C-alpha cells in the first residue's frame, strides 16, 4: 500500500480509528470524552472526504472514493455527528452510560462510508453488515427498558435473514458473472436480453435483503416495533443514515437504460405497496414513534418510485430526497428525543400544548412534520416535487398519481401532531423548558437544511448533478 492509497482511504481510517480510540479512552477516563472525540472524528472524516482531489480518486483495497462516495461519506459522517449531539443529554436522562455507545455510532458511520465507496460486491456486503451489526447493539443498548431488548432481538433475527438473502444473492451473481467487480456484474447480468436464471435469482435475493434494510413492504414488519422500542436518537440514526446507505447500495448496483427493465416489475410493486401500506397504517397509529415508523415506510416507497425510472434524472431525485429525508427525520426524532423525559411521552395526545411549554423543540418538530408532509417552502416539498417530476418524465404516470394521492393522505396524520402541539396550553407537561446546547446545535442544523434546501435548492441540485456525471 502506498502513501497515496492511505491518503484515499483516510476518511474510513479516521472513523474506524476513532471508534477504537473512544473504547480505549473509556478504560482510562470513563464517560468523559466519548461524544467529543466522536463528533470531532465525524467532522474530520467529512472534511477529509471533501478535500480529496479527483486525481487521487483511484481504487484501493476494493474501495474507490469517487464523487459519489465522497458525497455520501460527508452525509453519513455529519449525520453520525448530529446523532451523537442528540444522544448526549438523552442518554444521561435514560441512564445509558459507557463508551460503547459513541464508539458504535462511529463504527456504523464507518460501515456506511464503506458501502458508498465499494468497488466490488464483497466489500459492499461487508460494509452493509458492519453498519447492521452496529445497529444490533444500538437498538438494544437501553438496558433499563425491556422494550429496547425486545426491539434488539427482533432486529437481530430479521436482520440475519436479510444478511443471508444478500449473501446468497451475491454468491449467485458471482456464479453467473465470474467476477465481484460491480460494473462487470451489472454489465454481464443485467444487459439487454440477459435472462440467466442464476443471475435473476441472485438479483431477486438482493432485492429481498435490501427491502428489509429500507423497510419496503412486505419486509417492513420489524420497523414499527424497533422504532418504538429503541432509544429515540438511535431511531433518528437508523431511519436516516442506515437507509441512506442501503439506497447508496442500490444506486451502485442498479444500471440505467435498457438493463434496468429486468428489475422494473418487482421494484414497481415494492413502491406501490410501501406507499399505500405505509400511509394507511400511519393513519391508525396513536403512538408517535410508530406513526413515524409507518411514515418512513411510505417515504421509502417514494424513493423507489424515482428509482423505477432508471434514468440519471430519477437517480438525482433519489439522492436529493435522501439528503432531505435525513434532515427531516433527524429533526423529527431529535425533537422527540429532546422532549422525552424519563417517564416518556409516547402518544400523539401526550404532546397537547407542548408548543407553549417548550417552543423550540415543538417548533422544530412542527417544521419537520410540515416538511415530511411536503408543504412548501420546506425541503420536503422540493424533494417530493423532483421525485414525482422524474416519475412523470420516466413514464411512471399511474404510480406517480398514486404517490401524489398517498402524499396528500399523509398530510392528515402529520398535521394532527402539529394541531396537538399548539392546542390546549393548560395540558402541557410541567418540566424543563429548553433543549440542551448539544441538542440545540443538532436540531438547528437540521432545521437550517430543511429551510435552505426548500428555499434555495440550486446549489445542492448542481452538486448532485456533478456527482452523477
From Swiss-Prot:
Q: Does the keyword Transmembrane helix apply?
A: yes
**Broad class of enzyme this protein falls into:** translocase
Name the InterPro entries on file. NADH-Q_OxRdtase_suN/2, ND/Mrp_TM
Q: Which reaction does it catalyse?
A: a quinone + NADH + 5 H(+)(in) = a quinol + NAD(+) + 4 H(+)(out)
Which keywords does UniProt give here? Cell inner membrane, Cell membrane, Membrane, NAD, Quinone, Translocase, Transmembrane, Transmembrane helix, Transport, Ubiquinone
Compartment annotation:
Cell inner membrane
Q: What does the entry give for GO biological process? A: ATP synthesis coupled electron transport
Q: What is its EC number?
A: 7.1.1.-
A single GO CC term for this protein reads: plasma membrane
Protein task:
NDH-1 shuttles electrons from NADH, via FMN and iron-sulfur (Fe-S) centers, to quinones in the respiratory chain. The immediate electron acceptor for the enzyme in this species is believed to be ubiquinone. Couples the redox reaction to proton translocation (for every two electrons transferred, four hydrogen ions are translocated across the cytoplasmic membrane), and thus conserves the redox energy in a proton gradient.
Its subunit composition reads:
NDH-1 is composed of 14 different subunits. Subunits NuoA, H, J, K, L, M, N constitute the membrane sector of the complex.
Instruction: Tell me what this protein is called.
Output: NADH-quinone oxidoreductase subunit N
Q: What species was this sequence derived from? A: Geotalea uraniireducens (strain Rf4) (Geobacter uraniireducens)
